[in-house]
Amino acid sequence: MRKITFIAYALLFAFTSSLFANEVNIFSARHYDSDVQLYEKFTAKTGIKVNVISGKSGALEKRIKEEGADSKADLYITADAGRLGAFQANLQGGLASDTIKSAVPSNFRTSKWVGIAKRARIVYFAPERVSGAELAGLTYESLADPKWKGRLVIRASNNIYNQSLVASLIKNNGKGKISDWSKGMVSNMARAPKGNDRAQILAVAAGEADIAVANTYYLALMLSGKKGPEQQAAAKKVKPFFPNQD
């Protein structure tokens, strides 16, 4: 497989030698006009043409791996550092940009990738059914507390956001404790996991659950009205809570 750089907009970014050529090929799972504007400014400043191949992360990764050494990808932008594993052996190393190093804290970069954005994975609650006392001192770990039995919704465990959350909990608490924690989480679920992050927020708004775990980005997206008036109205019925703040 061709050596590529890996970018996750939640956590990754890096340059290859292609940036010293006349064009650079970016495989991107992002879909924002602001990115296009950045590419245009980059081309205007450097004279380097930016070719963007857009798609969902899974499809882009499949294409890159199938094309192997023939892949044209120079940079890959995706949604989570957890996706790094699929390309670990094929990433371009040697990131040497002093500008990047000064702008990005060391815990959000390596020699092969660097973060360009972050999203918080937090708890959403129904204010009419969840009291302030219940939320006091809430942590990700305490979501396994039996008091939340039948009240929690979260998307499936094969979701990369959940996998990264669990990885961080294992790092901080150890595999044994988080194995027990995961069983408690399952016991507390109001329903079998289904749907995306917005579906979890919708479930709380509809009274199917009292709390949900989802990324902050999705509440803002729903509140913006871009996903329709129904989701906008639902988003106004829930409140965000940031765990592990003590």
Residue map of PLM features:
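Bacterial N-terminal signal peptides that target proteins for export
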Residues: 1-8
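Sec/Tat signal peptide C-region and signal peptidase I cleavage site
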Residues: 15-21
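Early extracytoplasmic/lumenal segment of secretory-pathway proteins
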Residues: 21-86
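Loop/turn elements at helix/coil->beta-strand transitions in domains of secreted/extracellular proteins
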Residues: 22, 48-49, 71-74, 148-151, ...
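Residues embedded in well-ordered beta-strands
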Residues: 25, 122-124, 239
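Extracytoplasmic ligand-binding site segments that recognize negatively charged/polar headgroups
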Residues: 29, 33, 59, 72-208, ...
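Short helix-capping segments at alpha-helix termini
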Residues: 46, 95, 176-177, 229-234
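Extracytoplasmic/periplasmic substrate-recognition and gating elements
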Residues: 194-202, 206-209, 229-246
